[in-house]
Amino acid sequence: MNLLGKMIYVEGFMMIMATLLVSMSYGHRAMINDVAEAPVFDDVVSPNGLDSSWYDARATFYGDIHGGETQQGACGYGDLFKQGYGLETAALSTALFNEGYTCGACYQIMCVNDPQWCLPGSVKITATNFCPPDYSKTEGVWCNPPQKHFDLSLPMFLKIAQYKAGVVPVKYRRISCARTGGVKFETKGNPYFLMILPYNVGGAGDIKLMQVKGDKTGWITMQKNWGQNWTTGVNLTGQGISFRVTTSDGVTKDFNNVMPNNWGFGQTFDGKINF
C-alpha cells in the first residue's frame, strides 16, 4: 500500500472510531436517564431552604369524584373550593402531618414501580387533612406510623393510577405553592379567645410562627391551636390588626392593617400580599 493509501486508510479508521465513541457515549447517557428514579419537571419550583428531594411513600384515595368527604378536615380549612384548594388536596399520615404544622404545604406525587396500575405524569396537591392511624388492624394500615402515606382526593388519584389499584407506591417531594391573590385571614372565637385561620398561603405554604399586633399593642406571639388555627387570649376587639407570618422555610412577611378596628368574628380579610 502506497503512502497516500495508508493516509486514507488511517483517516477513515479514525472517523469510524469517533462515530462509535459518540454512539456509545449517547447510549450510556440514555441508559442513565432510563433508570433515573424521578424526572425533572421544569414548571415546579422548590421552596427556599426546604428539602425538595424525592422520597418513597404510598397513596390511595378517599371521597367521591366530586371531592365529597374531602372538605373541612383536620387542618381547619372549610370549603376547599371557595378557599382556592379545590380537588388538588390530600390527607397526610401521622409521619407527614406533623401535628398540623404541615397543613398548607404542597407536594408533587407520581405513581412508580407498578406498571400494571401506574399512569404517567404527576399531580400537585396541598395538605388539607389528616389520615388517622388505625391500631386495631394489622393489614392495610397505611396511615400508621412510621409509614408515609397520602390519602388523595379521588380525582387526583385517577390522574396517576387506575381506580382498581386501590393503593399504589409513589414518589413525592415538596414544591412551592402557587397561589392567586393574597393570604387570607379568617376570624373565629370570642373577645378573649381570638382564633385566626390563615389560608391561601403561597411559597412553602405551611406556617411555623404567627404573630398578631393591634393598634395599641406590640407583636404578640400566637399559639397553634389545632390544624392551621392560631390563637391568642389578648383582647384585640376595637383595634386594627396586623399579622406577621413565618413559613416553614424561614421566610417572614408582615401583613399590615389587614383588619380594620370594626372587624367582627366570622369574617375573612385579604392580606393583599403573598409569599
UniProtKB/Swiss-Prot annotation:
InterPro entries: Expan_Lol_pI, Expansin, Expansin/allergen_DPBB_dom, Expansin_CBD, Expansin_CBD_sf, RlpA-like_DPBB, RlpA-like_sf. Keywords: Cell wall, Cell wall biogenesis/degradation, Membrane, Secreted, Signal. Residues 1-27 form the signal peptide. Pfam families: DPBB_1, Expansin_C. One of its GO terms (biological process) is anatomical structure morphogenesis. Residues 72-182 form the Expansin-like EG45 domain. Residues 192-271 form the Expansin-like CBD domain. It is a peripheral membrane protein. CDD domains: DPBB_EXPA_N. SMART domains: DPBB_1 (SM00837). SUPFAM superfamilies: Barwin-like endoglucanases, PHL pollen allergen. PROSITE patterns: EXPANSIN_CBD, EXPANSIN_EG45. Disulfide bonds: none annotated. It is found in: Secreted, Cell wall; Membrane. It comes from the Eukaryota. GO terms for cellular component: extracellular region; membrane. Transmembrane segments: none annotated. Causes loosening and extension of plant cell walls by disrupting non-covalent bonding between cellulose microfibrils and matrix glucans. No enzymatic activity has been found. Belongs to the expansin family. Expansin A subfamily. This is Expansin-A23. The lineage of its organism: Eukaryota, Viridiplantae, Streptophyta, Embryophyta, Tracheophyta.
